[in-house]
């Protein structure tokens, strides 16, 4: 629930900010979120997945490799099956649909949030299973890191919805609904991973692959478009540093 709280608080910005997010601010927020997700994918998911497969010797990378690619392909499949519209775009993706712009914008961020919920779920599954390499602190750090990047993410969806003409209440609700999938995904992944604990490295790297797909497909283009695109790069580095520090110092 901690990451979902971050989304809700970010979405609440619509009640306190009168104007829509400027392009510069939106690129900074997208860059920060991307940095957090990349660092979380490396330190919280991929490295533990490889470490837990050390018994395989030179093939210890294999579970992480397989899980990573399955995660990428899973998000690619969802991208093609679910109609959605990225913030700031006029061209919808996925199958043709009569859904409104608001609904498709919410669906785009919902797709983004699926791997984040899965990442939290698989970390807690490892902790509850007694995995020595996944502690309560490391699971909590990942939850906090995703909550931190969910705050700007909530604002990124609620503020454009407001700019589209939605009321503040409906814009807030749209932002909140986009994050509901996270606790649901976390619980489902936690239950699935606990049923097949030996496959935990695959689950960890699956979540990493899905998260990095979102970063490359959505956040990097969003943080790099238009003039002053270097602001997105700077905030990417800030987000990466924050998540890396949290994971190494506290995890």
Region locations from a protein language model:
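Intrinsically disordered, metal-sensing/regulatory segments
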Residues: 1-251
